Curated annotation (Swiss-Prot):
Transmembrane segments: none annotated. Its EC number is 6.3.5.3. This is Phosphoribosylformylglycinamidine synthase subunit PurL. Mg(2+) 1 binds at residues 76, 509. The active site is at residues 32, 78. Monomer. Part of the FGAM synthase complex composed of 1 PurL, 1 PurQ and 2 PurS subunits.
Amino acid sequence: MFPQEEKLIRERLGREPNDVERAMLEVMWSEHVSYKSSRKWLKLLPTKNEHVVLGPGEDAGIIKFDDKTWIVIGIESHNHPSAVEPYGGAATGVGGIVRDILCMGARPIALLDPIRFGPLEKEKNRYLFEYVVKGISDYGNRIGVPTVGGETEFDESLDNYTLVNVACVGIMKPEHLVHSYVTEPGLKLIIVGNRTGRDGIHGVTFASEELSENAEEEDRSAVQIPDPFTEKLLIEATLEAVYTGKVRALKDLGGGGLTCAASEMVGKRGFGAIIYADKVLLREPGMTPLEVMISESQERMLFAVRPEDVEELARIFEKYELEWSVVGEVIEEPKFIVYWKGSKVAELPIDLLTEVPTIEWPMKEYKIEEEVGIPRISLQEAFEKVWRSPNIVAKRWIWEQYDHEVQGRTVVKPGFDSAVLKINEEYGIAITADGNPNHCYLNPYHGAMGLVAEVVRNLVSVGAKPLALVDNLNFASPERPEVYWSFAETVKGLADAAKAFNLAYVSGNVSFYNEIVDKPIKPTPVVAGVGKVKLSKIPKGPNKGDVVTLVGETKRELGGSELYRVLGIRKGIAPRVNLEVERKNAESILRLINASLVSFVHDLSRGGLLVALAEVAALFNVGMEVTIKTDMNPVEFAFSESHGRYLVVLPERKLEEAREITDLKVIGRIIGSNSFSVKINDEVLLWNLDKLKDVYWNTLYRLMD
């Protein structure tokens, strides 16, 4: 807390808070819990459309899939913990977002993991990468929730640090909805799951400040300990309890522990709570009430239940061999009172915990965009560098550690523009996640707009109609004027783009203070999207003889591109989005797919056209012959990251009909031979298909050996 906040608290209370109260207030007034620096700006985001059942404000958002099925989605970051202890930090990040989905009354069915690291040439970055992936893999596999997609990026600005964002999707019936807040007094508050220990104490305050050079030693105790086996039992027990209709409210004990879960649960509708902290089951001897109230031990849920229903639910918990205890009750008076062995150890007005004043930090606009000349490099040399980039090559080294088919719903697997999960015999959902800190660093507003556009392109490329979005905003300290300005610009860009597509943000997360030893990260918003797809219409893949076509205009837009990154060029102008064109092209692609006119569609984004072509060849083991005439420099045309573009592969006999829907420029053909050949004006790129595939599929393995 800042000195002026402490002064405000003393004035409200008319006294100094005691140690327990101070610890609880520090948790609730932390940036991580209160969103005090971001709340004002987040109000700009659209949160309603015809698909939204429940927008931001609870643990996850809910979208209507059909009359019998709702989709639940949320996203969280676990950046600081993963930078300090990558295995435990990443694993508990998975556990936390899964419980957020669970406490709405939904079964978690899939995970996405947008993760970012420093360059793999450094041993520390390889260590963070290896153990973050292992943490996500072990936890997800053991609880039986598949990790079906995400994205992985390596950038110099993240040296010795990591950004670990995890999104989770769940499925539920409308009648099973449980809210995270109570609507009546007299309810009993029950903690179910793991015993409470000293792990994760001050976790949210540690996540609300920059990391020091010695963070690995100093902050390890703030990282929670993962226990996926208990989580698996907790999922089944919680759902069985929810299906009885006897659960009045439900919260995950995550950041801020019991203090946060209980105060938010009762405070939303103006109720209060009495907590008997000595009734909490402990894992370690000698714990104090302060430690009990702010511990962030994992795999714990807080149930609000009428007194007459406690016994019935307890039988369910015991059936799954989960420990439980009644730790408090909901009261009419808006106070949060804590007892320890008969003595009152804390008493605070509930709104002092839950209604934290906003902060508006000073802002300073920065302008770093400037025109950069076209690099003097051949098409062959440029492709050699970009195609070998860890940001471009296949992430199979990661997927192979994940069980992405558990639960049997996965229709389109990792490695494509979106993953697709079967919901019923006819329809499924497509899910995807995207970030682009290089574009957002050059221009936060246009970079953020481009991000939403890319999510839409990824969804429609598999035939899905976009329904809703969630956002995870990773930034450095808001106390830096340039950072706070870039945050506000990012939110404006996310809002304007979503409105253009009539999309709403149903949930989200803000993670500030992502910097280590005074080195701030680039603005890194991540957007995940969900869409509805008819399973029979998903494009299956290219066939020999198909024509390769391009939809959308390629412009002179290399700023923030992967080509510039591998060449060490940090300047440039970020690509601009024409929202009208983007929307029109997305609608056209959906029409092409629904009319069964195409074999395959791939969005153009990182790496540009040449990378998209090579990805199709490598993914499907097909030869390709491409010839392009342009008034642009061949390297610029090949690696521009202009928005609004798609590769569309289709049988030649369907070309005429497809052109009635949209303008398709034929640039090449799928061939039977073992070659990947691209000619742009007079420059020729020729690769053997086996070599192309070897680089794509095996580079990450070689880097991690």
